[in-house]
């Protein structure tokens, strides 16, 4: 009698399906969801977000709510705007923390909120929006992009 080979255990991936108008149907692995214990300013009840990359809008990415997938915020790396940007000493480990700034797009142009960045802890899949106490950064840093009236 021959012994059976040892069972191979493969981890099961937990996947969520999100239906969005902007990006269509998105399949998201749980491990790619960032938990925001305090939500975002003005959206404290929303605690889970993903980052969506869309090659049509690079370098802009989208912070998309898992609970309300119709809600997404345009974000980008602040280092593309200011290479010397610093969200503070608590977040200086660039291997662990990734800051993103929320963009506001209007008919007058586009601005970035450098004063209240999103900081992603990529090791623990956590996120938070912080407020930098210094007056060094603006909530409406101009991007120099004029919004087109045609789409």
Task: Annotate the PLM regions.
Residues 1-151:
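Hydrophobic N-terminal alpha-helices or hydrophobic patches in metabolic proteins across all domains
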């Amino acid at each position: 009698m021959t012994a059976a080979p040892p069972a191979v255990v493969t981890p099961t991936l937990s996947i969520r399906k999100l239906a969005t108008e902007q990006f269509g149907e998105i399949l998201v692995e749980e491990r790619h969801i960032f938990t925001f214990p305090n939500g975002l300013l003005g959206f404290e009840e929303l605690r889970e977000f993903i980052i969506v990359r869309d090659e049509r809008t690079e370098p802009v990415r989208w912070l998309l709510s898992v609970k309300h997938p119709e809600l997404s915020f345009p974000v980008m790396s602040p280092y593309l705007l200011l290479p010397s940007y610093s969200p503070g000493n608590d977040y200086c480990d660039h291997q662990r923390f990734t800051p993103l700034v929320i963009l506001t797009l209007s008919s007058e142009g586009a601005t970035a909120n450098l004063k209240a960045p999103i900081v992603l802890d990529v090791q623990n899949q956590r996120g938070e929006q912080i407020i930098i106490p210094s007056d060094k950064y603006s909530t409406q840093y101009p991007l120099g992009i004029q919004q087109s009236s045609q789409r």
